[in-house]
């Protein structure tokens, strides 16, 4: 993402050791605290290495709530030093967070920052996770009609329910919901 912000899928303890050796001081886990083995291993290894572990539970197939965005903004404001950001696959939730980081901390334009949600990272827009792309698109559409700063839009205009309704009315979501998304089309084209 930047020279101080890295993204990944769920790290194993050996990955955390390698990152700590490279100077990473904070790990932001977008899966939230949970009782599964991967989280327990991550928690134990972060404690052993002296890494700060920040847990934020986000959903990959739902518009971020106002509370989600408040937690994300708080975490972004608190980043001080090399940081790893991850979810399960490093694609969807991580892409949303990294895009927001670039906008809020680095001043990157929204149209550029939204590229953190891309096929390069394993994110596929034409599935239910496309709601995260729609989040950025929704702002860009509003800003084209009525110019507004991104943070002002978040604070005064953003409505997760309206965003979700708008996304569900879209063509790609309807195809994915009926099982006719990209995966089904690719499967049908195989000999």
Model regions and ranges:
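Active-site adenylate/phosphate-handling loop in enzymes that bind or generate adenylated species
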Residues: 93
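Substrate/cofactor-recognition hotspot
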Residues: 90
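Short cysteine clusters
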Residues: 87
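Cys-dependent protein tyrosine phosphatase-like superfamily
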Residues: 1-83, 96-191
